[in-house]
Amino acid sequence: MHEQYLADPTSVSESWQDFFHDYQRDADPQATPPSPAPVLVEPVTPPVAPASVGEPIRGAAARIVANMEASLGLPTATSFRSVPAKLLEVNRRIINGYLGRTRGGKVSFTHLIGYAVVRAISDTAPAMNASYLQDADGNPRVMRPESVSLGVAVDLQKSDGSRMLLVPVVRHASGLDFRGFWGAYEEMIRKVRANKLSPDDFAGATVTLTNPGTIGTQQSVPRLMPGQGLIVGVGSLDFPPEWKAADPITLAELGISKVITISSTYDHRVIQGAESGLFLKRVEDLLLGVDGFYDEVFRALGVPYEAVQWRRDVNPIDRDRSMLEKQMAVANLIRVHRVRGHLIADLDPLRWKEPAMPAELDPATYGLTIWDLDRQFLTGGLAGGERLALGDILHVLRDAYCRTIGIEYMHIQDPLEQEWIQQQVEGVSPELDLDDQRYILERLNAAEAFEKFLATKYVGQKRFGLEGAESVIPVLDAVLEAAADAGLAGSVVGMPHRGRLNVLTNIVGKSYDQIFKEFEGQVDPDSIQGSGDVKYHLGQSGKFVARSGKDITVELAANPSHLEAVDPVVVGMVRAMQDAINEPEAFSVLPILMHGDAAFAGQGVVAETLNMSDIKGYRVGGTVHVVVNNQIGFTTTPESARSGFYSTDVAKIIQAPIFHVNGDDPEACVRVARLAFAYRQRFRKDVVIDVVCYRRHGHNEGDDPSYTQPLMYAKINERRSVRKLFTEAL
């Protein structure tokens, strides 16, 4: 039509005439140029160098070259996920704090992340354990192993400064609990460092974990090796880059967490992107404590506390009101730990009951979360500081009241006594020096060797041995050493029959010859005659020599098997001695009374003796009570024997402080013994040491306690002696 218009404008209608009047035809389309011929890309062949140029690559380095070249043919894809690391940091700190105070060792971030990777695959994402292979005819196949075997990339620096990458394997990692995984991982690392890896140690990996984050790499896409379907990369644990230079107090106030980036590089032929994404989500969930991940880790390692839980921060715009409420909560938390911190202390060597966190000791009860741990609060002078981060406040309180020592003292009405105890335990380093540790070990050696000799030499004879409570010997030793160094004139000890022979020998100084003669029926004719266990009733006088060279006279009062009958006798003997010395209020003779837990709670003479302890006519300036807490009375469990929570509750009638201590921590036992003596000297009052332990052989050596307490004695039979445990710790 346009051509018709050009030939004769009147041949078209007026409307088309108007349209074509200023119409311009588009430029003629140009022909599409022919596509260039494809360029054939020849594979790049490394230049052939003369033999004198460069260095030959041999051994493990040559295998790395071969593996890297083989990895080029794998069609991989990579997913990333950034995970908040706050909870990971907090729970790891608790774990390592406990391990550092007990058997030693350290759990790394890689241990926890590696275990989370294994758990995520085995529980939720088994597809990530698949790998690609071909049959003999070249047909594609997929292999799905039943268990996860984790290869761990280890960067090893050689003596010449060069680095080598080794990937040993934790086999069947999905069948291990965390303790087993941790042990297998550490054994593998020991082999790497000792250069003792065998070819078998490199075989069988189904998944590989690499952690370049240890050298600061934020995230990585590692190479996937043939025969595997997944390699997981772990980036650095740090604040996001935009916050790295921020003030730590500001970071805490804003609730900014460190993050860790985890990558999943997978074989796209057998693993799909959605599966990789779900896998990484499960890893994040586990590292945030979902499904009791950290609780399981704590139980596997024997950590006797509840794991910290993930919670959302509460930090509104109206921060002043919120912080005021939190400040009040922190003050309440400090007081509650002083009153009830002993409830979560690690006191039971057997740990046959699951730990539980009372609501009043849980910061979450007061609206405090992990995000408040780095925020500063007023402390009221706790550990000599006016302002501390909440994490530091909890650290001070739990070190003082919730480790292997638990203290009951807030029932005391005198604020000076309360303040004195706080000054002795809050923010004070619990470590003993090496000489003290060696001396404690010597005392434990003597206690255990004595019992073992009697058990071997006099088979079948009753001796009411101290096995399970050997720490009582270092306790008595520490009290008497402090008394000797303080210049006291003497001490009188009263005790029941359990452990009496050990105390006679290792504390009072009775000779082995005398003890052995009594086992062989050669009883001293001057002693009170009897039959059966008469040797467990006898008293003895001796001299205790402290390491300083100072000495103190010690008398162990005779006592029949009426347990607490000796209590008023000992106190009366001490009062008579003090009156004879004729130094009013000097109280230079120290009474020490040992008790069984059931007898201390169950016999009325205990309460009667306590009740008279501060009456002017009967005062002796304070008795040190040592309760050998077997956690059972003959065959009766605590819940069937008393109404109180502790066997020592009766001592509260005189407002005596009570120090509960784990008998399998002899260092803590000695610290408590010294503290108890110092309290007695300072306030001239009774004080109680509750050594929580167990009886290895029942009421006496002729009993089989597993009939009445099978679960308890299954634990006891698995338990090594306190001497063995302390030797390993040292």
Where are these regions (language model features)?
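C-terminal catalytic/motor cores of large multi-domain enzyme assemblies
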Residues: 8, 15-18, 25, 29, ...
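A glycine-rich phosphate-binding loop feature that marks nucleotide/adenosyl-phosphate handling sites
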Residues: 19-22, 203-209, 298-309, 350-355, ...
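Active-site pocket-lining segments that scaffold enzyme catalytic pockets across diverse folds
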Residues: 64, 449, 453-513
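Cofactor-binding active-site loop characterized by glycine-rich and histidine/acidic residues
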Residues: 492-655, 659-663
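Extended, charge-enriched "interface" segments that sit outside catalytic cores
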Residues: 23-44, 311-471, 488
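Phosphate/diphosphate-binding loops
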Residues: 375, 379, 383, 514-525, ...
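Hydrophobic alpha-helical scaffolding
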Residues: 6, 50, 54, 269, ...
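Short acidic, glycine/serine/threonine-rich loops at helix termini
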Residues: 217-220, 243-245, 348, 501-508, ...
